[in-house]
Amino acid sequence: MKLLLDRTAVLFVGLAVGATIAMSFLGGGETLGSAQASQPAPSAAAAAGHRAAEAPAPRLAAAIAQGRKVEIGVFGDSFGDGIWAGLYHQLRRDPGFEVRQLSERSTGFTRYRSLNILDDVRAKLDRAPVDIAVLSFGANDTQGIFDQGHGYAYMSEDWQRIVTERVTAVVGLLRTRGAMVYWVGLPKMREARFDADIQAMNRFYAARMAALDVPYVETLPLSVDADGSYAPYLPAEPGRERRMARANDGVHMTIPGYVHLMRGLSDRIRGSVAQARAQAGPGPARPAASEG
């Protein structure tokens, strides 16, 4: 049984990746019985993340009506740090957005003895509400779970029940605060066994988000080559050198890799903001770009 296995190696690398991200910006219901990975159709990459814009939630509509910045909060683990970096890079030139890093490394929905994610999200929202919440967890959760004196194996029925309850509570909290919610899935992993566990995680969360009516942003098709295999480089662009997309650990991405994953989501967010502006009609001017 994969019961309470230590993901120390992943977490340690996450710390290094987080430091790299910071330095980069300073410088510039069913039981899933099997944890087997499914291979995406190569053509799925073009559509991954590029879906129709979602209708604006109450806080987003209010932000537009009031002419204030749209506050986006990214919650997650060390991979969430990278999602924040990619989304920040995509939206930073638009003065109408503020993208906040609210992720915590070494966390997950199986690790509530280290950090209760619901309590952490609530405390952060109490300090500074968000209009849009982007969630990405899972790299630390391919292990058993311990709850109320009992341990349960990864992807067992009780594991799924407990994680579903915890995730549902977090999504419910965000919605009661008026925020739009997105869930970002994980990309393909280099090591086959870990990848099988991660793709089982992706299927689990995709089903949970569908049940909660939360948009699920798929990143798997953007992280493979034409054969559906792990791709360490970004797709080649005419006249440009290929750029590395994955970190050396085979788990995390490089900054260009995270930016690549977030193109679709940033477009969807812009689309929702455009809808909110159209619904609001003439009103306060958009936030001006800050100097410097």
Q: Which residue ranges define each predicted feature?
A:
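Catalytic His-Asp segment of secreted/periplasmic serine-dependent ester chemistry enzymes
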Residues: 2, 15, 19, 25, ...
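Conserved SGNH/GDSL esterase-like catalytic core that processes O-acyl groups on lipids
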Residues: 61-157
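N-terminal secretory targeting modules
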Residues: 1-73, 272-292
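Second-shell loop/turn segments in exported
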Residues: 70-78, 106-112, 153-161, 170, ...
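Active-site segments of SGNH/GDSL-like serine hydrolases
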Residues: 136-142, 168-203, 220-221
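Stable alpha-helical elements in mature extracytoplasmic
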Residues: 79, 83, 87, 117, ...
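Sec-exported extracytoplasmic/periplasmic mature domains
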Residues: 80, 88, 92, 96, ...
